[in-house]
Amino acid sequence: MFKRTIPLFAAFTLAISPSVFPNYAYAQEDKPKTNQYWWPKMLDLSPLRQPNATSNPMGEQFNYAEEFNSLDLNAVIEDLKKLMTTSQDWWPADYGNYGPLFIRMSWHAAGTYRIYDGRGGANGGFQRFAPQNSWPDNANLDKARRLLWPIKQKYGRKISWADLLVLAGNVAMESMGFKTIGFAGGREDAWEAININWGPEGKWLESKRQDKDGKLEKPLAATVMGLIYVNPEGPNGVPDPLAAAEKIRETFGRMAMNDEETVALIAGGHAFGKTHGAASGKYLGPAPEAAGIEEQGFGWKNSYGSGKGKDTITSGLEGAWTVTPTHWSHNYLQNLFNFNWVKTKSPGGAIQWVPENSNASSMVPDAFDPSKRHAPVMLTTDLALKFDPVYSKIAKRFLDNPKEFDDAFARAWFKLIHRDMGPRSRYLGSLVPKEIMIWQDPVPPVDYKLVDANDIANLKGKILNSGLSTSELVKTAWASASTFRGTDMRGGANGARIRLSPQKDWPANDPQELAKVLKTLESIQNNFNNAQADGKKISLADLIVLGGNAAIEQAAKQAGYDIIVPFMPGRTDATQGMTDVKSFEVLEPKADGFRNYFDKSNNMSPPEMLVEKASLLKLSVPQMTVLVGGMRVLNANTGQNQYGVFTDKPGTLNNDFFVNLLSMSTEWKKSSETEGIYEGYDRKTGKLKWKATSVDLIFGANSELRAVAEAYATDDAKEKFIQDFVNAWVKVMTADRFDIKAANTNINS
């Protein structure tokens, strides 16, 4: 299953050359065999079981936001500034300054973010764990993190590793003369590695992830296994700047960056530091996860010379881009356009470029010996900014307008290190910029009086008497809330963007039916709001969720249970102007097993896509199971298809789906008419009883899912089924409500 990500380009002080790790690592095959090994087609449910809460040593009651808000952030920053220029003998600082190393560390922590599934990014601090801690592109970042340990040790639980890894790079830029636009805390630490689809390759630095048209398979963003973005020497090691530009555009686009942001990031990032390729990669030992226990988490032990300082081997590339590697300047763009560049090789054997003009050979200071000077270098991916016509136009504009470049880089950098954090309401600390940016998916503030319990009861009555069916109300609420992704905290019901482009036109949402439902709900909203004399209002975002809740309460009542589905008002309605249409397009469900919807363009099976959807919603196996069972009997399939509606009382919330699925009175066969559809026949009469998809039948076929389905199919499970369904429903409806904690359901049978 898909989990976290990697996009890629040789960012900052490390650009990685595949040639430097000729025999880096192969996937091992001599381990104990898992069930997945013996039965490769077995549905993998592990995405719904991670992370494991028991792995967290801080305990369930730990409140990171409270801890961070009590932190003296200025003191941390001062300690970081001091650290930048306090060189350690065990890993000497280039030019006496660790700033560029920390920028690279921060970039590589955040730059794994990818738009198609929201995985990757700095949240969680996953650079500490395998595989990221041992990616070739992260070589020697183990030293950067170890340099930070005394500061982490000093401030403890008040600042997470995830926040510290990002803050260090931000402070590094400030300490070297660049003005950032701010920093937000709020990234909580993970305590275990998680499984993420980083690509199909079984060997580091291979690239076998393109489709027949040469495009990266979704949701991947990196072009090579083990790199953050792209091969800095050029695609497949071919030094072609124009071909490199195509790869850069694709991978940075999948990192949520447009062309201008891409140019700003590359040109700004490479204003600092240098690459390291004193010799061949043959001198390097194994990565941290494969190193000896005595190395204590360090990897890439270097047997060349002193193994550090001037003898450092990281990417295989060697040299600095500018004459001021530890001070902000515009020299990167000046050098890029002022020189003609000729191809050469680094001491480590990697392809790079130096000025044709021999007078440039003494421009750049040596990182350790003040008596030595060097020529500036460019990588093939740097030259892409000069020769790609679109990139070149932007880069020249930045060269001619330095202040515009400074602003563009500051904004792109802030976006890079915060893109995976979700809405601005999750930002913590005194350095959060006041400006609201469209990529933060803003929603208006609550500037009115919220509805009370009496209003809620009144509104539910009006909704239920509006002529809208249980199915329509449930489907609309689900379509609105289920866009949420727990990976990057995007989507959800807040904002009511289901009424805006592009969501209102998504096929999964039944656009015509949706328009009818929204029109009715908007009428109820307007009538209520216009009747209030005290400034009280209900948002459409709240009303959509309330409509789904009311329908569920009615459906449970038909089953003999009086329930109240917890509801907390406070959502507001975004405008189209607050919504970046292109940015929201990646949230479109191409499959939603909860609605029995599946677009055949998917490269995964319907059950796999169900697990993926449930994983993004942060659901457990039982929560996924009970939601599917409930949605089926509520007749909530897209297009009103009847697949999996195993009940003769659609619209009644009961456990019929599980009871009938597990009944041995039904024999299932593949449909001879429709691919992917199954038909259930009465074993005695031969009469067709039901039709289903593989998403429906997987709950009887997969042994683990069947165990959960059995729990909901027993005679004494009727009330538990409703209780669990409502709790899971509320979890989805409130997934983006970072201001509240979901309440427990109150059932009175």
From Swiss-Prot:
Catalyses which reaction(s): H2O2 + AH2 = A + 2 H2O; 2 H2O2 = O2 + 2 H2O
Amino acids binding heme b: 270
Annotated signal sequence range: 1-27
CDD domains: catalase_peroxidase_1, catalase_peroxidase_2
GO molecular function, one term: heme binding
Site (Transition state stabilizer): 104
E.C. number: 1.11.1.21
Alphabetical keyword list: Heme, Hydrogen peroxide, Iron, Metal-binding, Oxidoreductase, Peroxidase, Signal
Source organism superkingdom: Bacteria
Any one GO CC term of the record: cytosol
Covalent cross-link Tryptophyl-tyrosyl-methioninium (Tyr-Met) (with W-107) as placed by the record, residue numbers: 229-255
Cofactor notes: Binds 1 heme b (iron(II)-protoporphyrin IX) group per dimer.
Cofactors that this protein relies on: heme b
A Pfam entry, by short name: peroxidase
Per UniProt, location of the Tryptophyl-tyrosyl-methioninium (Trp-Tyr) (with M-255) cross-link in this chain: 107-229
InterPro entries attached to this UniProt entry: Catalase_peroxidase, Haem_peroxidase, Haem_peroxidase_sf, Peroxidases_AS, Peroxidases_heam-ligand_BS
Cited SUPFAM superfamilies: Heme-dependent peroxidases
Active site positions: 108
NCBIfam families: cat_per_HPI, PRK15061.1
Role of this protein: Bifunctional enzyme with both catalase and broad-spectrum peroxidase activity.
Oligomeric and partner information: Homodimer or homotetramer.
The protein, known as: Catalase-peroxidase 2
The encoding gene: katG2
